[in-house]
Swiss-Prot record:
Monomer. It comes from Rhodopseudomonas palustris (strain BisA53). InterPro entries: Elp3/MiaA/NifB-like_rSAM, Methylthiotransferase, Methylthiotransferase_CS, Methylthiotransferase_N, Methylthiotransferase_N_sf, MiaB_methiolase, rSAM, rSAM_horseshoe. GO terms for cellular component: cytosol. Binds 2 [4Fe-4S] clusters. One cluster is coordinated with 3 cysteines and an exchangeable S-adenosyl-L-methionine. Catalyzes the methylthiolation of N6-(dimethylallyl)adenosine (i(6)A), leading to the formation of 2-methylthio-N6-(dimethylallyl)adenosine (ms(2)i(6)A) at position 37 in tRNAs that read codons beginning with uridine. PROSITE patterns: MTTASE_N, MTTASE_RADICAL, RADICAL_SAM, TRAM. Residues 152-382 form the Radical SAM core domain. [4Fe-4S] cluster 2 binds at C166, C170, C173. This is tRNA-2-methylthio-N(6)-dimethylallyladenosine synthase.
Length: 465
């Protein structure tokens, strides 16, 4: 019997890439590959790349330089070592990756992961393989389903892609060019995925997409369903304890999604809703197609539906033309909304996007100062949100053993890590925890002990006449 070959995938960026990495593992399992956590002992390394953040391509080339040395060492010992570049940098850079780093065997875009086995075979035969086209077939329909043992090994929370691509064309963003137009999967296929996960121990499902609330997949009634309708359908699946979704666009928040938050107990009250800036002038330059007040009104609709709801967001500082007044508007928005957490980034131009042609660049030192100030405000809000948990009892889905012996870690409805001392048989259960302290960004608490059942009241004693 052939020895299994070892596969290591290093993922950068978004939740979609985490999911895609799992699907690549599933696609290569029938070829005899098993996953390893180290590139050093791998036979195939895949860099699963993201093109959103600063210097994304250069980070990939830096990683490839390290992998080239591993490939040379493997060759000196008579061992085959293969390198593949996947994801959005692969889609954007294409053949340039192989030109700059000839050690690369395969370059594959996000829509072609189901072709990985054939691409590896082609690379072994011809020396290189490149596929960055947008194939006609739905990759989700041809990727093999994950094996039961793989699902169980990945834990009690799982991602399910329901939508991919984006039609919004924000001026700074490469996603429409690297992931293509919006595509939604049929409800029936999503339901099959969810049931398979639940049957193998998953308790929490996160529906993901580049613009997930633009979901419009075909329902059982042959009509397009919204994300709200899909969530309602999945909430009725036995065994689904929690539902989440990410990432959303303010323009696509509709009445059905708001109603789902009002009516579905299993839909977690935590929404990632990027806004990018609090300045209307900058939002217009970003082609966001909404104002800061439009965003505030969307937040208000969510809070009216569920007062317990909390938010995270994304912000870009230093977008071309951003003035001090524009930045102050962003700080004002953050102060008014009050976030449980958020991510902030310095603007960096993405080649091929409209914003890359803008000339009014903000000085790097100003960007640094604004980023520090904004992230400081966000961090203070997150700390206050976490402190408010002390003394309360919250439901926690327990996921795994923690680093400290005897400690189990799970997550609250707001994705806060929560640690308790307990036996590991609570993994996979949602249990109440009383929070008594914080440790950095984690909550520390104790399981609420079940109350003993009260004995029945004795019947009144009666005497005969």
């Amino acid at each position: 019997m052939d020895q299994p070959r070892k596969l290591h995938i290093k993922s950068f960026g978004c939740q979609m890439n985490v999911y895609d990495a799992q699907r690549m593992v599933d696609a290569l399992a029938p070829e005899g590959f098993v996953e390893t956590q180290s590139a050093d002992d791998a036979d195939l390394v895949i860099l699963n790349t993201c093109h959103i953040r600063e210097k994304a391509a250069e980070k990939v080339y830096s990683e490839l330089g390290k992998l080239r040395l591993l490939k040379q060492d493997a060759a000196s010992h008579g061992r085959r070592f293969e390198i593949a570049v996947a994801g959005c940098v692969a889609q954007a850079e294409g053949a340039e990756i192989i030109r700059r780093q000839p050690a690369v065997d395969v370059v594959v875009g996000p829509q072609s992961y189901h072709h990985l086995p054939e691409l590896l075979e082609k690379a072994r035969r011809d020396g290189r393989a490149l596929e960055t086209e947008f194939p006609i077939e739905d990759k989700f329909g041809v990727l093999p389903p994950p094996r039961p043992d793989a699902i169980r090994a990945r834990g009690v929370s799982a991602f399910v892609t329901v939508q991919e691509g984006c039609d919004k064309f924000c001026s700074f963003c490469v996603v429409p060019y690297t992931r293509g137009a919006e595509m939604s999967r049929p409800v029936a296929k999503i339901l099959d995925d969810v049931k398979r996960l639940i049957d193998n121990g998953v308790r929490e499902i996160t529906l993901i997409g580049q613009n997930v609330n633009a979901y419009h997949g075909e329902g059982p009634d042959d009509r397009p369903w919204t994300l709200g309708a899909l969530l309602r359908h999945l909430a009725s699946v036995p065994g689904v304890a929690r539902l989440r979704y990410s990432t959303s666009h303010p323009l696509d928040v509709d009445d059905e999604l708001i109603a789902a938050h009002r009516e579905l107990p299993g839909l977690m009250p935590f929404v990632h809703l990027p806004v990018q800036s609090g300045s209307d002038a900058i939002l217009a330059a970003m082609n966001r197609r909404h104002s800061a007040d439009d965003y505030r009104r969307v937040i208000d609709r969510f809070r009216q539906a569920d007062p317990s709801i909390a938010f995270s967001s994304d912000f870009i500082v230093g977008f071309p033309g951003e003035t001090d007044r524009d930045f102050e508007a962003t700080l004002a928005l953050v102060t008014q909304i009050g976030y449980a957490g958020a991510y902030s980034f310095k603007y960096s131009p993405r080649p091929g996007t409209p914003a890359a042609e803008l000339q009014e660049m903000v000085a790097p030192a100003v960007m640094d100062q604004r980023l520090e100030q904004l992230q400081g405000l966000i961090d203070s809000q997150q700390a206050a949100f976490n402190r408010a948990s002390i003394g309360t009892t919250v439901d926690v889905l327990f996921e795994r053993a923690a680093r400290h012996p005897g400690q189990i870690v799970g997550r609250t409805a707001y994705l806060q890590p929560a640690h308790v001392m307990a036996a590991d048989d609570i993994v996979g259960q949602v249990l109440p925890v009383t929070i008594h302290s914080l440790e950095r960004y984690s909550l520390i608490g104790e399981l609420v002990k079940p109350q003993p059942a009260r004995p029945p009241k004795p019947l009144p004693v009666t005497t005969g006449a």
